[in-house]
């Protein structure tokens, strides 16, 4: 499954994996998964976290290692983001629910994920997605970026 990913995608997923893998031991635990999900405004129960881990935990050791994570991501990409998942993701970023993601909102979510970005990096991310040039990202622009990944 993961063999259909490009080198760029694998590098991106490696970066995402390290955001989850807080202690850097090469495995994601339910605790680490919970921390990241809560920082994104979700509130999963312990049982839900365990289910998520079990879904991809091929060797049954109770944690997700990078190859298992890659398989999960490859599967998720094949299902391509459903409209509902995209709306949910947009809502996570759009803190004030005004229909736009501002640079401040983008910075806030990325910082919660442990990703310290410079103002230039945040501005660059906005510029890449901001088709109409109004300095923020609307839902249509967000969908385009997410589908292009």
From Swiss-Prot:
The modification N6,N6,N6-trimethyllysine is found at residue 116. Ca(2+) 1 binds at residues 21, 23, 25, 27, 32. One of its GO terms (cellular component) is myosin II complex. It comes from the Eukaryota. Ca(2+) 3 binds at residues 94, 96, 98, 105. Ca(2+) 2 binds at residues 57, 59, 61, 63, 68. Residues 8-43, 44-79, 81-116, 117-149 form the EF-hand domain. Keywords: Acetylation, Calcium, Metal-binding, Methylation, Repeat. The keyword DNA repair does not apply. The modification N-acetylalanine is found at residue 2. Pfam families: EF-hand_7. Signal peptide: none annotated. Ca(2+) 4 binds at residues 130, 132, 134, 136, 141. GO terms for molecular function: calcium ion binding. This protein has four functional calcium-binding sites. Belongs to the calmodulin family. Calmodulin mediates the control of a large number of enzymes, ion channels and other proteins by Ca(2+). Among the enzymes to be stimulated by the calmodulin-Ca(2+) complex are a number of protein kinases and phosphatases. This is Calmodulin-3. It comes from Oryza sativa subsp. indica (Rice).
């Amino acid at each position: 499954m993961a063999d259909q990913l490009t080198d760029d995608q694998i590098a991106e997923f490696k970066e995402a994996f390290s955001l989850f893998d807080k202690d850097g031991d090469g495995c994601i635990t339910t605790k680490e998964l919970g921390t990241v999900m809560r920082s994104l405004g979700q509130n999963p129960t312990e049982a839900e976290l365990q289910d998520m881990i079990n879904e991809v935990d091929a060797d049954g050791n109770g944690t997700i290692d990078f190859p298992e994570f890659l398989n999960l991501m490859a599967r998720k990409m094949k299902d391509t983001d459903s409209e509902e998942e995209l709306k949910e993701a947009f809502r996570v970023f759009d803190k004030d629910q005004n229909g736009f993601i501002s640079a401040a909102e983008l910075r806030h979510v990325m910082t919660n994920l442990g990703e310290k970005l410079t103002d230039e990096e945040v501005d660059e991310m906005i510029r890449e997605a901001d088709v109409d040039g109004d300095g923020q990202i609307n839902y249509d622009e967000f969908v385009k970026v997410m589908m292009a990944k």
